[in-house]
């Protein structure tokens, strides 16, 4: 929901994750994270892996977050194709404070690291026929994008004092990247949210670069972090029912 600057920045982040990233992954039917907000799965397959999914553990701890990425990994491992429906519309409650936004990004980063480790346990097996090498190549690139940016930023911090004009050059590099993403988005969507995509890139470099390194250092922390109210217990088990599409 559009409540404040934080939620608008987060909307820009979601636009990037869906309109660009998942739309691209859809081209080779390899969406690696089917979003928990709205996804449809084959019920018979979910039943067959339900115990494995629900009892997943990582480094000795039960996995309580990232269940959407986890179920997508199971589908991919067993040869299913995953897709993104571009015209689906979902409304979600986002953190309205910077601290809440950081906690949410930490939760996402920890589960992303965990599920990337799981992904590599089968990535180089012949687990599917269609688009196999394309999927492998893109997952390796995605992993590099998870690891390299924090290392580059850490190196840049050390170089701040070594060269005159270094900050200005780095500012131009970030501006070029942010503008490129915004242009690609605008060409495809033709709306004003490209502005928030640009702002998100600057916010990430300036104040969120530490998220991934800290997530690596605190992988054993499995808390939800942004949930304020305890979920009410479900009185009965809801069985999956077929629906008309």
PLM feature spans:
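Non-transmembrane catalytic domains and loops of membrane-associated enzymes and transporters
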Residues: 1-127
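Transmembrane alpha-helices
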Residues: 6, 38, 42, 172-177, ...
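Short linear elements at protein peripheries
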Residues: 35, 43, 223-245
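Short alpha-helix boundary/capping motifs
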Residues: 74, 102-104, 133, 234-235, ...
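Membrane-proximal soluble regions of multi-pass membrane proteins
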Residues: 100, 104-110, 115, 196-236
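Short hydrophobic alpha-helical module
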Residues: 108-122, 130, 143-160
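Loop-to-transmembrane boundary segments
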Residues: 127-144, 238-245
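Membrane-embedded multi-pass helical conduit in multi-pass membrane proteins
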Residues: 137-223
């Amino acid at each position: 929901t559009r409540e404040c600057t934080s939620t608008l920045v987060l909307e820009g982040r979601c636009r990037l994750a869906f309109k660009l990233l998942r739309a691209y992954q859809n081209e080779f039917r390899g969406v690696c994270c089917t979003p928990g907000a709205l996804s449809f799965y084959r019920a018979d397959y979910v039943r067959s892996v339900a115990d494995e999914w629900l009892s997943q553990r990582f480094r000795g701890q039960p996995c309580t977050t990232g269940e959407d990425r986890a179920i997508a990994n199971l589908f991919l491992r067993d040869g299913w194709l995953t897709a993104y429906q571009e015209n689906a519309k979902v409304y979600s409650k986002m953190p309205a404070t910077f601290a809440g936004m950081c906690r949410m990004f930490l939760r996402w980063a920890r589960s992303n690291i965990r599920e990337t480790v799981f992904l590599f346990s089968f990535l180089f097996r012949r687990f599917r026929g269609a688009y196999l090498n394309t999927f492998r190549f893109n997952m390796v690139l995605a992993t590099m994008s998870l690891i390299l940016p924090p290392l580059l930023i850490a190196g840049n911090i050390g170089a701040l004092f070594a060269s005159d004009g270094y900050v200005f050059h780095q500012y131009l590099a970030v501006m070029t990247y942010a503008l490129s993403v915004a242009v690609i988005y605008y060409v495809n969507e033709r709306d004003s949210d490209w502005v928030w995509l640009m702002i998100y890139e600057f916010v990430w470099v300036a104040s969120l670069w530490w998220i991934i390194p800290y997530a690596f250092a605190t992988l054993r922390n499995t808390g939800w972090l942004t949930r304020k109210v305890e979920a009410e217990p479900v009185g009965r088990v809801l069985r999956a029912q077929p629906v008309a599409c």
